[in-house]
Structure formats: structure tokens, C-alpha cells
Amino acid sequence: SQFIVASLSNYEAWNNIIDSNQINMDLSGKTIIQLTTGSIEEVTTLNDWVKKYNGELLEGIISCFPSQIGTEESLILLAGSNNSVNNCKDIISVLSPKYKNLGSNLIAPTVLSRAFLSGALGGLIGMMNGAVLCQKADISLDDFKEICMDRSSIIEQESRRIIDAISTGDTKNTEASVSAWGHGQEALLAISKTLDSNLDFQLALNKLFKKTIEAGLKDHDLSAMCEIFK
């Protein structure tokens, strides 16, 4: 076959396969579509291995739950040569009707997917923290869910605005400064203490706000907090 598609539990499983099949290995005319998703080091090592045996590598990730593969909810991120991406689009479309070509930067899929995971995990963990606060205060989780769903469009708009602000470097213009958000977080921490909930998440947030303010960015937009992650 011209294409070899791999989607395994981890790169260790992949390495076990190739380590046992390297006698007279020749990948000339073949493209490996690697959807296992590894670390930056694993991706670069695999690329060197594929080149050694005269093959082409498409590095990618499947961004969805297993039950969503092949549905409109799925998304595949790919990196590699444009010719390889175009040649394998029929195969990729079976796994996901939507795919995005990230160009020749082979580490782009793994970094981009992890970057998205950072935002998604932070939001979901914060939401779970909020749910526990509601439970401790005898507030219905149906009410909590309703307000989360009702305000979701605002979070989406704010996410877009913050990413654009980071991209342009304009982190001064704001309706709500780091200081204002910080006061809100201090109040959240105080409520968490009063309700005797676990403080790990809120203390971590509090530390981030303090670092941002110490960096002289208290009057800047919340997007300025990106500076402390650099």
C-alpha cells in the first residue's frame, strides 16, 4: 500500500512495531500517516527514521473522542508536504470529514493540540471547581449549568479577543484590567475558604495574578498575563 496509517496508544507501541520489522526496510514511494500523537522529540526522531528509509511522513492528531471519529465532530490536524496531504485526503476524510493542513512544520499538530488542551483543561477544571462551590452552598447544579451555557458565548468571544490581542501585542486596551480580574479572583478564593473547599486551583490562579501584577501589568488587559508564561 502507498499509505501506512498508524493510530496507536503511544509511540512506545509504534517503536515496538518498527523495531521488529526493520530487516531490509524500504519505504520508497510510501507515506506514513502517523496519528498516534507524540512528544516533540518523538516526532523529530520518527521523521529522521522515515527519511532514513526513503519514506514520507505526515504527522497528525485526531482531535475528538473515539466515538466521534468519522463524524462532523471530529477534526484531524496534519503536517507534512502539501503533495502528501493532497494524495491522502480520501483516506483522511474517512476518519474525519474535517482536516486542517498545518504546513511543513511536523511538530505543529502535537504542539497545537496540546495548546488547545491547556485551554480546555483549565476551563473544565475551573468549571468543576465551581460546581463543588455550588454544592457546598446548596445551589442547584441545574442553575449552575444554565448560567454556564447562557454565558458560553461571552467566553467564546473573550477567547477570540484575547488571542487576537496576544497576536497583535496590544494588551493595554481593556474593559476589565488584570487588577479588576484579580479582585474577582481574590473574592473567589475567599468564598472557597469560607466553604471549606480544596484551594489548590484557586491558589494557583492567585499566584498567577500576583506574578502578573508584580510584572507591572495590573492596568493592562487580561491578555497581558501571557507574558508570565514566556
Task: Identify the residue ranges that each predicted region occupies.
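Rossmann-fold NAD(P) dinucleotide-binding segment
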Residues: 1-58
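Helical "substrate-binding/catalytic lid" subdomain
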Residues: 108-204, 208-229
